[in-house]
Amino acid sequence: MYNTLKTITLVHGVSGKEHRVANTLKEMIAPYCDASHIDAMGNLIAVKKGTSANPKKVLLCGHMDEIGFIVNFVEDNGFVRVAPIGGINWVACAFGEVVSDKGVHGVLVPNSGTKASDFAPDLFYIDIGADNKKNAERKVKIGDTFVLKSNLTKLNANRVVGRPLDDRAGCGIVLEIAKRIAKEPVADDVYYVFSVQEEVGCRGSKTAAFAIGADVSLTFDVTGTGDTAGSKPMAVKLGGGAAIKIKDMSVICDSEVVDKLTRIAKEKNIKSQHEILAYGGTDTSSIQMTGAGCRAGAISIPSRYIHSGVEMIDMNDYKACIDLAVEFIKE
């Protein structure tokens, strides 16, 4: 599991430029599905056909895109001004090493003298080591994208840290589910959706959900925890198991799906916890409301330091998410 997760975290894929991630995952999931394609939006959609004469459609979703920065101006002194892609935690990202989709390295820096309390997008630039505009433009152009440079690392036997676990962890879970049920008879059609542009408005999942017309869905994404110093009160903690989402700021999950996941976790002795997130949202909401709608649920991966280069998860929680989803599909 870890090696697969590490492989997909190494691929550059900000919102709108997920094609490398999609191609990597398409190759990885090929042995475990009946068909796959990349749609017009850029979503990767794979399917395992069910054995039932009248199968229902089950949609499993993780988003491929990550937060990052897009070049919008090159200054005369060679500094590269950028705009954010997605919700950037500027304090966490300041003075971090970044790398572009073309392999150009640099450092994300705030204007000299800027206080952390005043951090804002227009106060940041990337220093790529160029001493003037001409030299900088040999390496970058308007529209190039940068991401935080941080490889996945094991802290101990269970906990890993790096980027972009939001949401390559969700993609990894969907892939591991496909592996687990590949040779098992499953009554329903299972659609594996690796969506695009979640970080900028849950866009890709809307078109994928419309095309599929699912009866039920499970979304896999990271969620915050309440177990760090000074964190807001929250029941979710790292190492507490798969987080069964009840609601967040964008969705109220289907009560039957929540109850079923809760029951299965108890019956199968899968470590779990319940999630009520007071901020943010995921593809769950867009899938739930697309077309005629569907019974939407989510299994979240507890994570610390989201939208930074040091996102942290527990691999036992990761495995619990996979185990719970597999048992849900079998029923």
Task: Annotate each predicted stretch with a short phrase.
Residues 1-331:
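N-terminal hydrophobic/helix-forming segments and targeting peptides
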